[in-house]
């Protein structure tokens, strides 16, 4: 469902979403106490192949990269999915409604968990937390496991309540490239090969069509800021925190001042599909206390596939 043009324009003028309150993570002990409760849903954010090997009992699957559909991004003003499709996924397939408490987890590194977390928060799921340390920490502490296919859950009614202060559209990013006094664009991709354009990635155009990005490179003015700088557990090891502590995250922001960071700027984070490394950087900056952070969900999948959009001049 498309927003009317006026409503969309007003959405861009809304105040930024507040900084996170510190409850975006849940420890393994608290998560274990939630197993089996009727209004709790555990959601796996990595690939289904990994899921079938071992997962928390009763889990469903919402692989972060599959939540970004380029055709929907273009059709629905920057959303990773159009609202009707997202409602069907969240309520119909995942069995989540307004009263559901959701715990998202991945193997342990946290990037994909952040993508699914971001997707659910964006569409209005109120109670969503990430399992700190992911499956690796859960296993290390003897948490129960099962293998095989996702749980079959009853469909629930879910009405999206989109928070557009969480995202930036391609038009807003284009504006940001020419307004460094008010915007900072951060490229959260992990390698310089992606940033420079040597590496080209694939993503979903629609639910049944995968494409390879046509052009490599970066958005003009974007600062290389890999998500691993903010990660406490980039290798997915047991008993390591998903995110660095707020003081450590704030030090990373201090380092970015030489690249134009300022607390009053709108920071736009992107990666290849937005839901993953870009959303992890969003989560980290919010945890560090930055107010106006947005994910460009279209990310390089949209920008790199549009020949009318400029590329950064890189050495």
Which stretches of residues belong to each language-model region?
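Bacterial N-terminal signal peptides
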Residues: 5-16
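Cytosolic catalytic domains that perform sulfur/thiol-centered chemistry
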Residues: 19-315
């Amino acid at each position: 469902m498309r927003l009317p043009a006026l409503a969309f324009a007003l959405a861009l003028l809304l105040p930024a979403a507040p900084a996170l309150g510190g409850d975006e993570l849940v420890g393994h002990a608290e998560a274990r106490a939630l197993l089996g409760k009727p209004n709790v849903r555990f959601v796996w954010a990595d690939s289904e192949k990994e899921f079938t090997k071992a997962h928390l009992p009763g889990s469903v699957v919402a692989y972060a990269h599959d939540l970004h559909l380029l055709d929907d991004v273009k059709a629905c003003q920057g959303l990773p999915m159009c609202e009707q499709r997202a409602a069907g996924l969240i309520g119909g397939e995942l069995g989540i409604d307004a009263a559901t408490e959701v715990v998202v987890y991945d193997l342990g590194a946290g990037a994909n968990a952040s993508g699914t977390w971001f997707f659910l928060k964006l569409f209005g799921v109120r109670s969503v937390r990430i399992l700190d340390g992911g499956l690796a920490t859960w296993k290390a502490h003897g948490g129960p496991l099962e293998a095989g296919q996702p749980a079959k859950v009853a469909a629930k009614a879910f009405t999206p309540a989109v928070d557009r202060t969480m995202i930036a559209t391609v038009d807003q990013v284009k504006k940001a490239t020419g307004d460094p006094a008010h915007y900072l664009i951060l490229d959260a991709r992990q390698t310089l090969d992606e940033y420079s354009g040597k590496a080209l990635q694939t993503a979903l155009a629609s639910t049944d069509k995968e494409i390879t990005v046509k052009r490599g490179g970066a958005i003009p003015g974007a600062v290389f800021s890999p998500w691993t700088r903010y990660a406490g557990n980039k290798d997915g090891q047991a008993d390591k925190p998903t995110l660095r502590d707020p003081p450590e995250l704030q030090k990373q922001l201090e380092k970015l001042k030489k690249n134009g960071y300022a607390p009053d700027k709108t920071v736009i984070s992107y990666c290849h599909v937005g839901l993953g490394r870009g959303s992890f950087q969003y989560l980290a900056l919010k945890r560090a206390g930055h107010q106006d952070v947005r994910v460009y969900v279209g990310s390089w999948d949209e920008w790199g596939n549009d020949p009318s959009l400029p590329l950064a001049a890189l050495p």
